[in-house]
């Protein structure tokens, strides 16, 4: 197993002494120490070892750190290159031990040989709360990690070597389950190595998760001129993952090299979340990204949720592809730019998948969650809070992120064909609603060939299953509209009349023009539009005419 061959304890500030004191630590009250911006040896910390060692990671304690870190830069020296510094690409993996104490693993993209290590830490967001490093453990590169890496033909772990058989993987799994004789603990990289072996078996059996081709047309970069900010650029990946779970996000691009920064972010969400703790983003690089799903809430229900990808560039010809290893598969319907038979076929396939999936959620929970040692999901099955009970439907102007059982139960019909037709009609009703609303804002893709500032947004709105605050039954927030369990039945609509005042009212909040918005008033214009045929309007046009021609300022 892993050999713990050096232990370093840091004193406060930038002391470089070993003090044999478990209560001391390195601290910097800043958001970056040279991991985001270019730093020098004056930044970070340097450890000189007693001799040269081969390693692929090291770990350190986070003390009582309140805010996480997500960036690390590593330089090293060895006998071969003397005083010439070397660099290695590294990822910072946030972990929690059995007592829920936070610690970090600094994992290199490949093993290195070093006699001196220099580490710089940081965040890719502005936060001046303290970064802290407690005891550091260096781990010598071990045979198990080497042997697991050796079954792959490439660094990104997308191809197996020809000699790999089922027994090869089974033997490695048996070794991985062995505990260290001295400590009784599993390998520090247990979750990551287990996922590597699961991926290997999926490759061997041709059952790997499909590749998701990113839509580069969906980007916030195109919508800055619109004057309203309630839009959402998330693209669903068909995965849900629990807090603390290890996942691998493999990013491919035809012209970029492994390790190069991708114009992509992974969005991690909390299922049935409060409005303030719905998501967190992780920047991605081309190649393999190892990610530990962060915990977004401390409340007493399952922790975790759907995963999404966001394209942050502005090039319609960009060609990113993404595969997620790990997590749990959930049904997704991607109707972006789909029309005619392609749309019909996609909806029918989704209905078939959803029917099978929703009937087995409780069973899947008991297999994957109730038996899980992680505190994140080790709960008795609760239909309204299980993170497996989720699905996404992405249209051009709207995305639904709702409980799978609620979506299924609200679709009318008995046969697959009847349900597919009813779902198509329900989704068309929402698409027609958004077309109506945007036309009244002067936005359309039908006006002229070069649509310019009058084009429809490239992003969509997002109606999400959320936890309500006191007195609310739905709400509009920065990039989503929150609905509770009883309102998560939008796929049962036969026309836009079925959406009602509330949904239109919240959509109005998110597409209200900032230049004239008066909260709870101007957004109701869209609610009036949606309900006027059935219920009339709360104003008459004669009064409107008198007001706008009166040369007076202020409300009517």
Predicted features and spans:
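Aromatic, loop-rich ligand-recognition surfaces of beta-strand-rich domains
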Residues: 23-85, 100-143
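Beta-sandwich interaction modules
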Residues: 93-115, 122-127, 281-304
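Beta-rich interaction/scaffold domains
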Residues: 142-204
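Beta-strand-enriched, solvent-exposed domains that form extended recognition/catalytic surfaces
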Residues: 199-343
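Exposed beta-strand and adjacent loop surfaces of beta-rich binding modules
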Residues: 55, 69-73, 173, 246, ...
């Amino acid at each position: 197993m892993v050999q713990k061959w050096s232990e370093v304890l840091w004193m406060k500030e930038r002391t470089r002494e070993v003090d044999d004191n478990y209560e001391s630590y390195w601290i910097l009250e800043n958001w970056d120490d040279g991991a985001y911006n270019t730093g020098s040896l004056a930044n970070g910390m340097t450890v000189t070892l007693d001799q040269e060692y081969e390693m692929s990671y090291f770990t350190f304690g986070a003390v009582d750190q309140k805010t996480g870190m997500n960036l690390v830069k590593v330089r090293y020296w060895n006998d071969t290159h003397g005083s010439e510094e070397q660099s290695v690409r590294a990822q910072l993996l946030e972990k929690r031990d059995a007592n829920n104490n936070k610690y970090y693993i600094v994992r290199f993209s490949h093993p290195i040989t070093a006699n001196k290590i220099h580490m710089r830490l940081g965040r890719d967001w502005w936060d001046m709360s303290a970064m802290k490093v407690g005891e550091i453990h260096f781990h010598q590169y071990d045979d198990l990690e080497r042997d697991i890496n050796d079954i792959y033909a490439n660094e990104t772990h997308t191809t197996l070597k020809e000699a790999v058989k089922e027994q090869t993987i089974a033997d490695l799994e048996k070794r991985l389950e062995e505990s260290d004789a001295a400590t009784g603990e599993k390998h520090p990289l247990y979750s990551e190595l287990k996922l590597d072996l699961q991926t290997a078996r999926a490759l061997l059996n041709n059952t790997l998760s499909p590749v998701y081709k990113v839509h580069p047309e969906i980007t916030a970069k195109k919508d800055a001129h619109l004057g309203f900010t309630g839009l959402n650029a998330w693209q669903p990946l068909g995965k849900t993952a629990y807090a603390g779970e290890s996942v691998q996000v493999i990013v491919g691009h035809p012209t970029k090299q492994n390790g190069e920064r991708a114009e992509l972010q992974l969005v991690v969400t909390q299922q049935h979340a409060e409005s303030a703790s719905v998501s967190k983003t992780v920047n991605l690089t081309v190649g393999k990204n190892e990610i530990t799903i962060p915990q977004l809430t401390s409340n007493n229900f399952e922790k975790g949720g759907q995963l999404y990808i966001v394209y942050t560039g502005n090039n319609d010809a960009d060609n990113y592809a993404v595969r997620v290893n790990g997590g749990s598969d959930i049904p997704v319907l991607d109707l972006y730019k789909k029309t005619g038979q392609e749309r019909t076929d996609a909806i029918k396939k989704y209905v078939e998948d959803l029917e099978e999936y929703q009937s087995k959620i409780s069973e899947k929970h008991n297999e994957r969650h109730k038996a899980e040692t992680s505190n994140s999901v080790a709960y008795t099955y609760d239909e309204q809070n299980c993170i497996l009970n989720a699905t996404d439907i992405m249209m051009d102007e709207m995305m639904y992120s709702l409980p799978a059982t609620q979506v299924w139960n609200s679709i009318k019909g008995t046969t697959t064909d009847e349900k597919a037709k009813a779902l198509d009609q329900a989704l068309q009703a929402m698409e027609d609603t958004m077309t109506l609303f945007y036309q009244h804002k002067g936005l359309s893709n039908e006006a002229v060939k070069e649509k310019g500032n009058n084009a429809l947004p490239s992003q969509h709105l997002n109606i999400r299953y959320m936890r309500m605050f006191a007195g609310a039954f739905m709400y509009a927030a920065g990039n989503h509209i929150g609905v509770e369990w009883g309102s998560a039945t939008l796929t049962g609509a036969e026309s836009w009349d079925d959406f009602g005042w509330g949904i239109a009212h919240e959509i109005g909040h998110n597409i209200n023009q900032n230049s004239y918005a008066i909260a709870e008033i101007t957004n109701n214009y869209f609610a009036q539009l949606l309900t006027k045929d059935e219920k009339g309007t709360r104003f008459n046009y004669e009064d409107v005419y008198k007001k706008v021609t009166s040369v007076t300022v202020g409300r009517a």
